[in-house]
Amino acid sequence: MNPAQILLTNDDGIQSPGLWTAASALSDLGFVNVVAPRDQFSGAGRSLPIYSDGLIDQQKMEVDGRDWNVYAVGGTPAQAVLHAIFEILPEKPILTVAGINYGENLGTGVTVSGTVGAALESATHGIPALAISLETKREYHLSYSPEVDFSTAGFFAAYFGRKLLEKTLPSDVCVLKVDVPCEATPDTPWEITRLSRKIYYHPTPPDRDSWDQPGIPSYEVVGDPLQD
């Protein structure tokens, strides 16, 4: 019997240590197909921009002594999901996992997340999806910093991935979104909650003196992860 096909993607890009922690953690659950954006696409949401080139680069990577065939896609996380479903995987996956993301996805800004966007795109095709993120310091959000320990988040990726394989989500739920606190351990209890309607990532204006200078809006963290 062929192993279950699991799709793994992210928004931080194919080289992200968080992605590879998830790949190793999920490997006991089925055959993990790693199909992720070639580039950093944090903040892409569920966008499907027409200017993406859609190029697919099959690569070989060694992680934890194991060789992986992986696919770097010239597109957003949601587009990576579509390429995986339409062109790459031999059959429709039974589970999609997006992550592990550098930085928590909370509050009203959750729809900006490419991690969540990939999970939502999967769900529209009837594939159960898990989006998982790890709380980190602000300066690590767009990095591949080795200072971040993803091991506990990897444990919960496998834990909740197994739950989704064993049980179906309620009919009114399309995505399971998990945020792992930075100080959590595998023994940390978890609970089901709801998203706050308050701003967690507060947009800030471009840092420039005139419009002919390059600049884009940024953000600062103003919320509390435990805020109601």
Protein language model annotation of sequence segments:
Residues 2-6, 20-87, 91-92:
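A cross-family phosphate/adenosyl-ligand binding-site feature
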Residues 12-20, 210-211:
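Short acidic, Gly/Ser-rich segments with clustered Asp/Glu that frequently serve as metal-coordination loops
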Residues 33-35, 71, 97, 128-132, ...:
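Hydrophobic/aromatic beta-strand patches that form the interior of the parallel beta-sheet core
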Residues 84-90, 117-128:
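Alpha-helix C-terminal capping segments
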Residues 94-103:
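Short acidic, glycine-rich surface-loop motifs adjacent to enzyme active sites
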Residues 104-113:
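Glycine/threonine-rich flexible loop motifs
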Residues 123-145:
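Glycine-rich phosphate/pyrophosphate-binding loops
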Residues 144, 148-228:
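Electrostatically charged, flexible surface regions
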